[in-house]
Amino acid sequence: MSDVQEATNQLLDVNLCENQMSIQVTESGPRSESEHLQVTIGATVPTGFEQTAADEVREKLGSSCKISKDRGKIYFDITVDSLAQVHCLRSVDNLFVVVQEFKDYQFKETKEEVLKDFEELAGKLPWSDPLKIWKINTCFKKKKTKRRKLNPNSSKQKIDNGRGDTTVEKDVKKELTNSVSDSQISDYYENPAIKEQVSTLIGDGLTSCKDETEENSKEEADPEVLKFRVTCNRAGEKHCFSSNEAARDFGGAVQDYFKWKADMTNFDVEVLLNIHDNEVVVGIALTEESLHRRNITHFGPTTLRSTLAYGMLRLCAPQPTDIIVDPMCGTGAIPIEGATEWSNCYHIAGDNNPLAVNRAANNISSLLTKIQVKEGKLPLGLPIDTIQWDICNLPLRTGSVDIIVTDMPFGKRMGSKKRNWNLYPACLREMSRVCRPGTGRAVLLTQDKKCFAKALSGMGHLWRKVHTVWVNIGGLHAAVYLLKRTPQSFVHPSEEDGERCPCTQR
């Protein structure tokens, strides 16, 4: 059997997830080699947090991890039974299985020759094992279309300022009930039968699915043809071709090889062609939408990605019983991510804007509803609270906070750069008051690096900069600063100064 025939046979049933729960576990016997199939997984991560993501992979999967020279990507090897755990990683945005990697691809001198090589490349690649992973991955990936149905109702709830939360909870429950991703990932760990089902699907060549397809083929003369698209991500200045040209010619060759149907929007398979200078990686996407789309259902004008929030929290290494505060929480992305991953700490989400506090509270409520649907019982709650306050006058005791993690106003969509010159020093001063001397730390994200550097220079006796991570947020070059609280005690400024906090100025 040729490689293309084998790959096609593994893809007979597109709707695997809809039929997974009806598959019966066969008699236990010798496990096939396919069950122990090892592949390389690629993941996109927030730029600057590649090392953080690599550390999480080593910690949770026990796999060695390689950081790509192409910023924002990591690679690691797994076996099939670890696939569900990969989808539970908190620091990765998108996942793909590597078909083949060319570390030093030799591009020809002319565009015509390069594109001709791309056409010939499609028939030379080892597609079989990656397509097996793609097939079983459909049981774990989140469905993009079902999330879109929820968004219009969520927007209406924002206008109502939190009224009608029952409708939102019903929509969340409906979404979670119809989706297999979260519940089946949980069942994968707790129920050995699910693991056996996965093994059966791979080891026995998707026997049950093929049987069902054969029954359907009696009604339909031809099996459904898979739809696909090719996406080319290219970085480098020495290429004589464009991304569209590479995707077009390589995609045409893939279509001729598999006899699939090209569809740029409603596709089943997304083939990736990643090019960075002389490094070429061909892969198959394992996520329909970024994994950072979790936790948040009520969005604000500046909602931080959950993957970036996780990276910021991990930078400060939370310990059990730590009190972690986000004094400018917005939608609550950071404290919600913290309460989910570090449940042995206590998290406080605060903001001076009542709408932001309301959004954070609604996001916490939605997360509790999600947990209730997943576990089938009322959750005990999360170690998190919300409060409205003034960042320059926090209602917290001096030296009572272990960690401060926050996304500071950039002065773009929120606030202004002019106000930041007064706001940043006042924020750092108040943060130094509530943070524990000697052991306290702060992780602060800002794009207004010049203003922050000036404010920090005047706080050298209270804060010491330990590390800086350069990140890209929506095209803006920002920085995440890890600060350590010095042992020096905080001294209140004299009342004679009469300094007004910029947070309260109108």
Curated annotation (Swiss-Prot):
Gene3D superfamilies: 3.30.2130.30, Vaccinia Virus protein VP39
EC number(s) from the headed UniProt entry: 2.1.1.256, 2.1.1.-
CDD domains membership: THUMP_AdoMetMT (cd11715)
Cited SMART domains: THUMP (SM00981)
Tree of life domain: Eukaryota
Keyword NADP: no
Function field: Catalytic subunit of the THUMPD3-TRM112 methyltransferase complex, that specifically mediates the S-adenosyl-L-methionine-dependent N(2)-methylation of guanosine nucleotide at position 6 (m2G6) in tRNAs. This is one of the major tRNA (guanine-N(2))-methyltransferases. Also catalyzes the S-adenosyl-L-methionine-dependent N(2)-methylation of guanosine nucleotide at position 7 of tRNA(Trp).
Protein name: tRNA (guanine(6)-N(2))-methyltransferase THUMP3
Annotated source species: Bos taurus (Bovine)
